[in-house]
């Protein structure tokens, strides 16, 4: 009984409930809730990241300078038919630095991770601004790392 009393009167933080039984009263199977489900932070290989493109999986992850951001709530920009859809499931660093949305600036999952060491100061500044935008708007959920034997 004390659990219910604490729940109703503030003793339990519902955001920390591992059972998923508390919350805003919405069902956990509600499709509108899928984009807000928490994602466990971790390491992503480019191959793994490529699955989170809004097509193969509802979630949309984008990497910038080795950090992976959950951009699912920006689906209108990064999802299918969005203006930045080419970045979904990829390392978008070079494309953002060059202000280019062409596929030829995005590496495939089986290519080495782009070191970005040939960018000009202006391109680095542009990438800095984009990264700040992502850091302020989307949760960082992990790190992009090379897959042994693949991205080397």
From Swiss-Prot:
Residues 46-145 form the Cytochrome b5 heme-binding domain. Residues 24-35 have a biased composition (Polar residues). GO terms for cellular component: endomembrane system; endosome; membrane. SUPFAM superfamilies: Cytochrome b5-like heme/steroid binding domain. InterPro entries: Cyt_B5-like_heme/steroid-bd, Cyt_B5-like_heme/steroid_sf, MAPR/NEUFC/NENF-like. GO terms for biological process: regulation of ergosterol biosynthetic process. It comes from the Eukaryota. Signal peptide: none annotated. GO terms for molecular function: heme binding. Gene3D superfamilies: Cytochrome b5-like heme/steroid binding domain. Pfam families: Cyt-b5. Disulfide bonds: none annotated. Residues 18-37 are annotated as: Disordered. Belongs to the cytochrome b5 family. MAPR subfamily. Present with 6300 molecules/cell in log phase SD medium. The cytochrome b5 heme-binding domain lacks the conserved iron-binding His residues at positions 81 and 105. PANTHER family: CALCUTTA CUP-RELATED, MEMBRANE-ASSOCIATED PROGESTERONE RECEPTOR COMPONENT-RELATED. This is Damage response protein 1. It comes from Saccharomyces cerevisiae (strain ATCC 204508 / S288c).
């Amino acid at each position: 009984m004390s659990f219910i009393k604490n729940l109703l009167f503030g003793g339990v933080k519902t955001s920390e409930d591992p059972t998923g039984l508390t919350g805003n009263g919405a069902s956990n199977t509600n499709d509108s809730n899928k984009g807000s489900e928490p994602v466990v932070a971790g390491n992503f290989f480019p191959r793994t990241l490529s699955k989170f493109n809004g097509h193969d999986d509802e979630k949309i992850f984008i990497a910038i300078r080795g950090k992976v951001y959950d951009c699912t709530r920006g689906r209108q920009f990064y999802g299918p038919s969005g203006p930045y859809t080419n970045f979904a499931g990829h390392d978008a660093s070079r494309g953002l630095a060059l202000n280019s949305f062409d596929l030829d600036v995005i590496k495939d999952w089986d290519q080495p991770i782009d070191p970005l060491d040939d960018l000009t100061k202006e391109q680095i500044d542009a990438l800095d601004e984009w990264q700040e935008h992502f850091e302020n708007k989307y949760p960082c959920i992990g790190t992009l790392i090379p897959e042994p034997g693949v991205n080397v």
